[in-house]
């Protein structure tokens, strides 16, 4: 579950870097028809290619990046009974969910957390923190693992990549329309694209990407409810509720890097506008949704 902010940050970085490289190479000149007006058809194709390209590059490297960022120890040969139990539990849940066996790992953090990421249902990683293993009993850890396996089985990362690709396309498209307008109307540049276009486009990309993340975060919150339900089916509803209640009782701040904080099962807390940018619903809402499920 530690996937959203790292995915978004990687996407934004790729879009900005691509914009800089393309500008330096002069590729963006194809978007200026006759030196006066934008070729909107070419712009839309350009935006879609690089919007979806950035999104799927992020997806392709998500597992590798998560391993490096969180220093995950992937369990290949179990060193103890705990690692053996983790492998057996994930293997059983993956079989029940109808997916290939994910890699299973542990990362060192006092923060009770877990995440799933990967390119596809059959090429995924499920990892838990040492803090989660220390603070939760076996039933609760089983429920958390079920939640993460459900994310993989639901294809959340691929779906997120598609949504992010659409969002990226509009961000790139609209940013260049705004840049073109500022360059022509405000700075009265009548030929080609001047510095105003370049600067405005980069700033607009960042602003639009932040605003567009509200859409992605809303989607993420809905998928969390679905993953909770999946975890309840794989491990048992009471176990899933107990795990979330244990997380709610934890008041220590997250020890994850800022760009990874929303990937974890704990999620975050926020009210008002801040809630729009949360990748997870409040734990209270998630617990209520589970309790409302039919037994």
Swiss-Prot record:
The chain crosses the membrane at residues 4-24, 42-62, 155-175, 197-217. Binds 1 zinc ion per subunit. Its main location: membrane. It is an enzyme of class 3 (hydrolase). Zn(2+) binds at residues 147, 151, 224. It is a multi-pass membrane protein. The keyword Ribonucleoprotein does not apply. The active site is at 148. GO terms for biological process: proteolysis. HAMAP family: Pept_M48_protease_HtpX. This is Protease HtpX. One of its GO terms (cellular component) is plasma membrane. The keyword Transport does not apply. It comes from Thioalkalivibrio sulfidiphilus (strain HL-EbGR7). Belongs to the peptidase M48B family.
């Amino acid at each position: 579950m530690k996937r959203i902010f790292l995915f978004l940050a990687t996407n934004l970085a790729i879009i900005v870097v691509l914009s800089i490289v393309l500008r330096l190479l002069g590729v963006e000149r194809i978007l200026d028809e006759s030196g006066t007006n934008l070729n909107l058809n070419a712009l839309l194709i350009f935006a879609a290619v690089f919007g979806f390209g950035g999104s799927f590059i992020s997806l392709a490297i998500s597992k590798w990046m998560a391993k490096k960022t969180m220093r995950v120890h992937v369990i290949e040969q179990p060193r103890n009974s705990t690692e053996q139990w983790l492998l057996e539990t994930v293997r059983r849940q993956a079989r029940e969910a109808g997916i290939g066996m994910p890699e299973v790992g542990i990362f060192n953090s006092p923060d009770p957390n877990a995440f799933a990421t990967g390119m596809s249902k059959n090429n995924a990683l499920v990892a838990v923190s040492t803090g989660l293993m220390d603070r939760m009993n076996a039933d609760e850890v089983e429920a958390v693992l079920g939640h993460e396996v459900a994310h993989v089985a639901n294809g959340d990362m691929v779906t997120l990549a598609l949504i992010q690709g659409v969002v990226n396309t509009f961000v790139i498209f609209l940013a260049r329309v705004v840049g073109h307008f500022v360059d022509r109307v405000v700075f009265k540049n009548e030929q080609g694209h001047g510095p105003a276009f370049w600067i405005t486009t980069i700033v607009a990309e960042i602003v639009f990407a932040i605003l567009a993340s509200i859409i992605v975060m809303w989607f993420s919150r809905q998928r969390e409810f679905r993953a909770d339900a999946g975890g309840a089916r794989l491990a048992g509803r009471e176990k899933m509720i107990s795990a979330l209640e244990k997380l709610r009782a934890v008041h220590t701040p997250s020890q994850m890097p800022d760009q990874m904080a929303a990937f974890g099962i704990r999620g975050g807390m926020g009210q008002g506008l801040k809630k729009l940018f949360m990748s997870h619903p409040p734990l209270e809402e998630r617990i209520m949704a589970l309790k409302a499920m039919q037994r």
